[in-house]
C-alpha cells in the first residue's frame, strides 16, 4: 500500500514539472533536478506540447518557432554526411543548436520513471520549481484525489406523476439556455378572438355574377349602413305605415356597365334607360300562400348559408335578372320569433327606352325601333327578431321599351348575339297586381306578336317561364357555390375552379383578333430567322423539319435535365458535320469537279461543301489544324510510320480544305485527337498516301488509351469511307 502511495505522489510531481516546463522557461539547475524524476518519454511529451504552442521544444530557449516551416517532405537525405534527417523532429526547434542540446538532455534521461524515491528529496526538487508537496509516509489517497468531498444527495420531492418530455428536458425551442415567452395563453386568447370574429362575419359572404359580361365573387364584411324605407302592412285593409329600417348591405364589385348606369342616373335623374316613374302597391294577407310557394322555390335554388346573391342575364329576346340576398340568420334563442318580411314594389307604367337600332341601313333608310324588355325580380329575406307581423314578399319589376316616338337619345343598346336577325320579334308584358286592384288576375301576361299565332294561357306561359328561370338559377347557383368554395379553400385558383364547376369563360373578339395577329407575326418571324442566322445548322438536315410547333413531338427539357454526350457521340457528330461530298471525292482520288457523284452514296446523303463568310471557316480550319499537328507525332510513333511528318501534314491540310467547317471546334482531349488523326490517316491511305495502309492495323494502343472500341471506330470510319477501301467493287449512288 505504501508503494502505491509513493507511485501516485511521484506521478503527480512529474505532472507538475511538465506543466511548469510548458508554461515557463527553466534554468540549468531546474533542468538537472527534473532529470532525477522525469523519464525520456515525459520529456518528449513536453517538447511536443511546446511545439504545438509555437515555442521552441528546448525548455531553456525562450524563442518562438519560425512561421515559414518547410513542408517538402518528412525526411531529408544528406549526401555529404550520408545521413537521413527527420524533418518533423527538426521542426520542433528554432535552431540546430537547440535540437542538439535537447537531444543531448533527452539521452541523459532514464527510460522509465523510478517508483522508489524519498519524499524529502521529492520536496526539495519541487521547491526549486516554486511548489512544495508534503509527502508523508502514509498518504491519504481519498484526500489527495478529493474523493472525500463527494456527496450524494437524494431528491425526496419526486412525485409519482409522469412528466411530459418538454417539462423534463426543457422547451424544445430554447436556444443556449434561453427560455422563450410562454405564448400558450396568448394563443388561446387569439384563437378565441378569431372564432368570435368568424361567428360575427360568418354570413357576410356575397357573390355577384352577371353573364356574359362580368363574373365576380366578392367576400367583404359590411361596413356601411343604409337607411331604407320599408312599407309594412298593419292590417288587411290596405293601410300602410312607413317605418325606418337600417339595412347593412354587403359590399360587392360593380361592373363598368353598372358604373356608367349609376353615373347617368345621377346626371339625368333617371335610371339611364328612360325609366323615371315609380308606383308602390302593398299586398294584403291573401297572397301569403303564394309568397310561401315562392319562398320554397328559392330555397331549392341551391343557395348556401353564406348568403349567396346571384344575378343572371339571359339573351333570349328579353332579359331576366335574378337578385337574391339573404341576411344572417338569427340566434337559436330567437329562432321562433324570426319572421319573413318583405315588400312588393311594382314599378309599372309606360317607361320609355331611347336608342337607335343596331341594324340600321347604311344607305339612308329609316331605322326601325327594336322592341326589347328586361324584367328584374328581387326577393329579399329579412330574418330579424321583430314583433309579430305579416310575411310580405318584396318584388320589383320594371319594363323598358325602345320607342322612337317617345324619347330620343344617343344611347345604343347592345343586341343579343344569340338572336337571329330574321326571327320574329316578341313584346311581352308581365304585370304584378293585387286582387283588390280590379285589374284581373294575380299575374297577367300579354303577348304582342307581330304575326298572329296560337295563343297560350297565362298559366302555361308562367309555368314555362318559371321552369326555365328556376333551372337557370339552380344551375348557376350550384356552379357558383362550387367555384366559390374551391377558391376560398385555396385548393385551386379561379380559372381551375370555374373549369371544374362547368363555367366556360370566352374571350372577347378583340382579344382573339390580337392573338391571331400575334401568331401571324410569330410565323413571319420564324420564316425570316434562317436568313439572319450567322451560324448555319448541320449540313444535310433541313431547317424546316426541326422543332415545328404543330408537326413535331419535341418539347422543352424538364427542370434539372442535363444532356451529356459520350466521347464517341461527340466525335461521331463532329465527323458527320465536317465530311462533305468534296471530302469523299478527295479521299477516293477524284477531282473536285466530280464531287456531285458522291452526293448520295449507299443511301447516305453528303451535302456540298459549305464555306462561311467573314473568314470564319478559315479560322476554324486553322484551329483544327493546330490540334491535329500536336497529335500527329504521337500517332506516327505508335503506328511506326516510315514517312515524313511533313508529307502527312500536307495530306491532312488538303483533306481539311474539302470539309464543311461551320461549327465551333469541340473540346477534345489529346487522346481523342489521336483517334481523329488515325481516322484521317486511314482515309488518306486509300488513294492519296497508300504506303501507310499496312501500318494502320497497329491502332490498338491508340484506341485503348482513348476508350474507343473497334466497333465504335468502324462506325466513325463508315462516315469517311462509305464505299470501303476498294471503291471499284462497292455499290454507289444508292444502287
Curated annotation (Swiss-Prot):
- UniProt enzyme class: hydrolase
Gene Ontology biological-process annotations:
cell differentiation
- Domain of life, source organism: Eukaryota
EC number of this enzyme: 3.1.3.16
Question: Which keywords does the record carry?
Answer: Hydrolase, Metal-binding, Nucleus, Protein phosphatase, Zinc, Zinc-finger
The residues that the entry says bind Zn(2+) are 56, 61, 94, 98
Coarse class of the primary localization is nucleus
Per UniProt, the RTR1-type Zn-finger stretches lie at 33-118
Chain positions covered by the region annotation Disordered = 179-201, 349-374, 519-538
Bias-annotated ranges (Acidic residues): 519-530
Q: Where is the composition biased (Low complexity)?
A: 349-364
Indicate the family of this protein. Belongs to the RPAP2 family.
Which InterPro entries does the annotation name? Rtr1/RPAP2, Rtr1/RPAP2_dom, Rtr1/RPAP2_sf
Its annotated compartments are: Nucleus
- GO MF term (any one): RNA polymerase core enzyme binding
Q: Which PROSITE patterns match?
A: ZF_RTR1 (PS51479)
Summarizing the function annotation, the protein's role is: Putative RNA polymerase II subunit B1 C-terminal domain (CTD) phosphatase involved in RNA polymerase II transcription regulation.
Please provide an example of a Pfam family that matches this protein in its UniProt record. Answer: RPAP2_Rtr1
- Keyword Hydrolase attached: yes
Q: What is this protein called?
A: Putative RNA polymerase II subunit B1 CTD phosphatase RPAP2 homolog
Source organism of the structure:
Arabidopsis thaliana (Mouse-ear cress)
Instruction: Describe the reaction catalysed, as an equation.
Output: O-phospho-L-seryl-[protein] + H2O = L-seryl-[protein] + phosphate; O-phospho-L-threonyl-[protein] + H2O = L-threonyl-[protein] + phosphate
Amino acid at each position: 500500500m505504501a508503494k502505491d502511495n509513493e507511485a501516485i505522489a511521484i506521478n503527480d510531481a512529474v505532472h507538475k514539472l511538465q506543466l511548469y516546463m510548458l508554461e515557463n522557461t527553466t534554468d540549468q539547475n531546474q533542468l538537472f533536478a527534473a532529470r532525477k524524476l522525469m523519464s525520456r518519454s515525459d520529456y518528449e511529451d513536453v517538447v511536443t506540447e511546446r511545439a504545438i504552442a509555437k515555442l521552441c521544444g528546448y525548455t531553456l530557449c525562450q524563442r518562438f518557432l519560425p512561421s515559414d516551416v518547410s513542408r517538402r517532405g518528412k525526411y531529408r537525405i544528406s549526401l555529404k554526411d550520408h545521413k537521413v534527417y527527420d524533418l518533423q523532429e527538426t521542426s520542433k526547434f528554432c535552431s540546430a543548436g537547440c535540437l542538439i542540446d535537447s537531444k543531448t538532455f533527452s539521452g541523459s534521461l532514464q527510460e522509465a520513471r523510478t517508483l522508489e524515491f524519498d519524499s524529502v528529496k521529492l520536496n526539495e526538487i519541487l521547491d526549486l520549481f516554486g511548489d512544495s508537496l508534503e509527502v508523508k509516509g502514509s498518504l491519504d489517497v481519498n484526500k489527495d484525489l478529493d474523493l472525500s468531498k463527494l456527496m450524494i444527495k437524494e431528491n425526496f420531492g419526486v412525485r409519482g406523476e409522469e412528466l411530459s418530455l418538454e417539462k423534463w428536458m426543457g422547451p424544445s425551442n430554447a436556444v443556449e439556455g434561453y427560455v422563450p415567452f410562454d405564448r400558450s395563453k396568448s394563443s388561446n386568447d387569439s384563437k378565441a378572438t378569431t372564432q368570435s370574429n368568424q361567428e360575427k362575419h360568418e354570413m357576410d359572404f356575397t357573390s355577384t355574377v352577371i353573364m356574359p359580361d362580368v363574373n365576380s365573387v366578392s367576400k367583404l364584411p359590411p361596413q356601411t349602413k343604409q337607411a331604407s324605407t320599408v312599407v309594412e302592412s298593419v292590417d288587411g285593409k290596405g293601410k300602410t305605415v312607413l317605418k325606418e329600417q337600417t339595412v347593412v348591405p354587403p359590399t360587392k364589385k360593380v361592373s363598368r356597365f353598372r358604373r356608367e348606369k349609376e353615373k347617368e342616373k345621377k346626371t339625368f335623374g333617371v335610371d339611364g334607360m328612360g325609366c323615371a316613374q315609380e308606383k308602390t302597391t302593398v299586398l294584403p294577407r291573401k297572397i301569403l300562400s303564394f309568397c310561401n310557394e315562392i319562398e320554397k322555390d328559392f330555397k331549392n335554388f341551391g343557395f348556401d348559408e353564406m348568403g349567396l346573391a346571384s344575378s343572371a342575364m339571359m339573351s333570349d329576346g328579353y332579359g331576366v335578372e335574378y337578385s337574391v340576398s339573404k341576411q344572417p340568420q338569427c340566434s337559436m334563442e330567437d329562432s321562433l320569433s324570426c319572421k319573413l318580411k318583405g315588400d312588393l314594389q311594382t314599378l309599372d307604367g309606360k317607361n320609355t327606352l331611347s336608342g337607335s337600332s343596331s341594324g340600321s341601313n347604311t344607305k339612308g333608310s329609316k331605322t326601325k325601333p327594336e322592341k326589347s324588355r328586361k324584367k328584374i325580380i328581387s326577393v329579399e329575406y329579412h330574418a330579424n327578431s321583430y314583433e309579430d307581423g305579416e310575411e310580405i314578399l318584396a318584388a320589383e319589376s320594371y319594363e323598358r321599351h325602345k320607342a322612337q316616338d317617345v324619347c330620343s337619345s344617343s344611347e345604343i343598346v347592345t343586341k343579343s348575339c344569340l338572336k337571329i336577325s330574321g326571327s320574329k320579334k316578341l313584346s311581352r308584358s308581365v304585370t304584378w297586381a293585387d286582387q283588390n286592384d280590379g285589374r284581373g288576375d294575380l299575374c297577367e301576361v300579354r303577348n304582342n306578336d307581330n304575326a298572329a299565332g296560337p295563343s297560350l294561357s297565362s298559366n302555361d306561359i308562367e309555368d314555362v317561364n318559371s321552369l326555365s328561370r328556376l333551372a337557370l338559377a339552380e344551375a348557376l347557383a350550384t356552379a357558383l357555390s362550387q367555384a366559390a368554395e374551391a377558391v376560398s379553400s385555396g385548393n385551386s385558383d379561379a380559372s381551375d375552379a370555374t373549369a371544374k364547376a362547368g363555367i366556360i369563360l370566352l374571350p372577347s373578339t378583340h382579344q382573339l383578333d390580337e392573338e391571331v395577329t400575334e401568331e401571324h407575326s410569330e410565323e413571319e418571324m420564324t420564316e425570316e430567322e434562317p436568313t439572319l442566322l450567322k451560324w448555319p445548322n448541320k449540313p444535310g438536315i433541313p431547317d424546316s423539319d426541326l422543332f415545328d410547333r404543330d408537326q413535331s413531338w419535341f418539347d422543352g427539357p424538364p427542370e434539372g435535365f442535363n444532356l451529356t454526350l459520350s466521347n464517341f457521340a461527340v466525335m461521331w457528330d463532329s465527323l458527320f458535320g465536317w465530311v462533305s461530298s468534296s471530302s469523299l471525292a478527295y479521299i477516293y482520288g477524284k477531282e473536285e469537279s466530280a464531287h456531285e457523284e458522291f452526293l448520295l452514296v449507299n443511301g447516305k446523303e453528303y451535302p456540298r461543301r459549305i464555306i462561311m463568310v467573314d473568314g470564319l471557316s478559315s479560322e476554324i480550319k486553322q484551329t483544327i489544324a493546330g490540334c491535329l499537328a500536336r497529335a500527329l507525332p504521337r500517332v506516327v510513333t505508335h503506328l511506326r510510320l516510315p514517312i515524313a511528318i511533313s508529307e502527312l501534314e500536307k495530306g491532312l491540310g488538303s483533306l481539311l480544305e474539302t470539309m464543311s467547317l461551320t461549327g465551333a471546334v469541340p473540346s477534345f482531349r489529346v487522346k481523342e485527337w489521336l483517334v481523329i488523326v488515325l481516322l484521317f490517316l486511314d482515309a488518306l491511305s486509300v488513294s492519296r498516301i497508300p504506303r501507310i495502309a499496312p501500318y494502320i492495323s497497329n491502332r490498338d494502343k491508340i484506341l485503348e488509351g482513348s476508350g474507343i472500341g473497334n466497333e465504335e471506330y468502324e462506325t466513325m470510319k463508315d462516315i469517311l469511307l462509305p464505299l470501303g477501301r476498294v471503291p471499284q467493287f462497292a455499290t454507289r449512288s444508292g444502287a
